[in-house]
Amino acid sequence: MSSFQIYRAALLLSILATANAQQVGTYTTETHPSLTWQTCTSDGSCTTNDGEVVIDANWRWVHSTSSATNCYTGNEWDTSICTDDVTCAANCALDGATYEATYGVTTSGSELRLNFVTQGSSKNIGSRLYLMSDDSNYELFKLLGQEFTFDVDVSNLPCGLNGALYFVAMDADGGTSEYSGNKAGAKYGTGYCDSQCPRDLKFINGEANCDGWEPSSNNVNTGVGDHGSCCAEMDVWEANSISNAFTAHPCDSVSQTMCDGDSCGGTYSASGDRYSGTCDPDGCDYNPYRLGNTDFYGPGLTVDTNSPFTVVTQFITDDGTSSGTLTEIKRLYVQNGEVIANGASTYSSVNGSSITSAFCESEKTLFGDENVFDKHGGLEGMGEAMAKGMVLVLSLWDDYAADMLWLDSDYPVNSSASTPGVARGTCSTDSGVPATVEAESPNAYVTYSNIKFGPIGSTYSSGSSSGSGSSSSSSSTTTKATSTTLKTTSTTSSGSSSTSAAQAYGQCGGQGWTGPTTCVSGYTCTYENAYYSQCL
């Protein structure tokens, strides 16, 4: 993805504290908001999990361990406390969060709402949260051979904003077991990393990032340090009401690593060093609008962003198992009871509607993009990180590096919009300036709800209903619906299915498969490999 810089304007006592971090403060008790989500099985039954979310350490007050004196104010460190990276980590503490009042974060049952601007005793901009398995560990998702489904409402996200849901290869405990300088851990949202190898993090690997710190020239709250935090990133969803993309970003290592200076590459390094790091900062992306399908996604279009909808992402392996090699990433939607196939590319040289190795190579060639995706392992490398387990990130942000034009406008701005790959959405090239977006759209927000995870074909047919009611028990189950309306971008067919027919895009065959082997009306059971056939 492009730069992930979720910025905020001055928190009363401190701003944008650590992201892999030091000691624990005692001024505010940390209480994680609850969030239910479901795991599903191949027969369509789903079990509700009583989870919780934690805000990233970058949003927290960080202060001296011996007082309420800020370690970091504005976009500068207090050099009397933070004389070097190691000393700073020992001298500074993260404190608890007040989620709704300070950050505009609320939950209700399975629904998480993130407000863009929250005006409390100070002004907060955006947020980044992680799903937890317990009070001290992040939930790890192993995506291979599975599908991940959620409902989203982007109707209140204008040009320049990004409601992003994605996975990164963070440590489950936030780094406490590996780095003795990190006492806060996942409970306080530490350990962040992504494919941009972000250098705006205040703490990495249990040490501060104050050495070589340079305050930002266009943001009063941020800066760049000598170190960055790198790891593989699977952007399942980056979107506003105008455009969306899903993108795979592999890295050379399946685990988080620390990098130095401009050799980190990515958004935070000098332009000539963008591709000098160990990760792919561009990734292999699928944006229907960028691929010429300009009538698929947006207000009043096939996927109508005026209303909530369900996003389904499938991670297909060569043998249909969770231990196979990643070969394809598929997308479909459910809205108003209709299953909607992903908007296909309109370019003859870039075929299909999913991410495959062939798609990535042909897209890079057509758009003239440097193919660093293959350099860092391609889909197979992305799959290796998935096999290890990845942490779910839920966020809302604006973009001080590129005004989000890479998502929803013409980018680069000095290229003709008629050049393949330049047009990414209908937003003006003058849009997305953070100061303008924050002033004109302070009430923007995104909601994520009804998160489900399970074998391919197990989640979405029961996940299209709206609502966020809380389950009474972590062991309660819901049963997959047995009828739906089916829709592609060119053809619509309706009819009831039964337990003897697989749903649209569901599994319908393969070695060891015991479910239905026929498809609902309008769909054909299509052979993918010896272990997997799908209704297409």
Swiss-Prot record:
Record's GO cellular component terms: extracellular region
Q: What is its EC number?
A: 3.2.1.91
Q: Where is the active site?
A: E233, E238
Region named Disordered: 464-499
Cysteine pairs forming cystine bridges in this chain are C508-C525, C519-C535
Q: What class of enzyme is it?
A: hydrolase
The GO molecular function terms of this record are: cellulose 1,4-beta-cellobiosidase activity; cellulose binding
Q: Name one GO biological process term.
A: cellulose catabolic process
> Looking at the record, which segments are called Catalytic?
22-458
Tell me where it mainly resides. Answer: secreted
Q: Where in the cell is it found?
A: Secreted
Which keywords label this protein? Carbohydrate metabolism, Cellulose degradation, Disulfide bond, Glycoprotein, Glycosidase, Hydrolase, Polysaccharide degradation, Secreted, Signal
Q: Which PROSITE patterns does the record cross-reference, listed alphabetically?
A: CBM1_1, CBM1_2
- Pfam families (UniProt xref): CBM_1, Glyco_hydro_7
Which family is it part of?
Belongs to the glycosyl hydrolase 7 (cellulase C) family.
What does the function comment of this entry state? The biological conversion of cellulose to glucose generally requires three types of hydrolytic enzymes: (1) Endoglucanases which cut internal beta-1,4-glucosidic bonds; (2) Exocellobiohydrolases that cut the disaccharide cellobiose from the non-reducing end of the cellulose polymer chain; (3) Beta-1,4-glucosidases which hydrolyze the cellobiose and other short cello-oligosaccharides to glucose.
Q: Quote the protein name from its UniProt record.
A: 1,4-beta-D-glucan cellobiohydrolase B
Q: What is the species of this protein?
A: Aspergillus niger
Gene that produces this protein: cbhB
